[in-house]
Amino acid sequence: MGMRMMFTVFLLVVLATTVVSFPSERASDGRDDTAKDEGSDMEKLVEKKECCNPACGRHYSCKGGR
């Protein structure tokens, strides 16, 4: 391949990567907000020494009945 062809392929790859990355970043913003909300809910339960999540259930009791 010539230098022009290699440069053209490089530009196409960069453009395709940029176009593909935009929708995934927008979609992750909403999920991050939800994860932060769930994390704060978990912190509130841990403060009460109560947690039904399997990640913290072995250290705290689960009175919620989950």
Curated annotation (Swiss-Prot):
The record's subcellular locations are: Secreted
Propeptide span(s): 22-49
The keyword Secreted belongs to this UniProt entry's keyword annotation: yes
**Keywords, A to Z?**
Acetylcholine receptor inhibiting toxin, Amidation, Cleavage on pair of basic residues, Disulfide bond, Neurotoxin, Postsynaptic neurotoxin, Secreted, Signal, Toxin
Q: What GO molecular-function term can you cite, just one? A: toxin activity
Q: What is its main location?
A: secreted
The residues the entry assigns to the signal sequence are: 1-21
Entry's InterPro entries? Conotoxin_a-typ, Conotoxin_a-typ_CS
Spell out which residues are annotated as carrying Glycine amide. 64
Which stretches are annotated as coiled coil?
none
> Which tissues is this chain's protein expressed in?
Expressed by the venom duct.
Q: Could you tell me which cysteines form disulfide bridges?
A: 51-56, 52-62
Q: Show the GO cellular component annotation of the record.
A: extracellular region; host cell postsynaptic membrane
Q: What else is known?
A: Both the globular (with C1-C3; C2-C4 disulfide pattern) and ribbon (C1-C4; C2-C3) isomers shows no or very weak activity on alpha-3-beta-2/CHRNA3-CHRNB2, alpha-3-beta-4/CHRNA3-CHRNB4, and alpha-4-beta-2/CHRNA4-CHRNB2.
Task of the protein: Alpha-conotoxins act on postsynaptic membranes, they bind to the nicotinic acetylcholine receptors (nAChR) and thus inhibit them. Both the globular (with C1-C3; C2-C4 disulfide pattern) and ribbon (C1-C4; C2-C3) isomers reversibly inhibit human muscle-type alpha-1-beta-1-delta-epsilon/CHRNA1-CHRNB1-CHRND-CHRNE nAChRs (IC(50)=116 nM and IC(50)=643 nM, respectively). Both isomers also inhibit alpha-7/CHRNA7 and alpha-9-alpha-10/CHRNA9-CHRNA10 (IC(50)=1113 nM by globular isomer) nAChRs.
Written domain comment of the UniProt record: The cysteine framework is I (CC-C-C). Alpha3/5 pattern.
Q: Which family does it belong to?
A: Belongs to the conotoxin A superfamily.
UniProt name for this protein: Alpha-conotoxin GIB
Species in which this protein is naturally found: Conus geographus
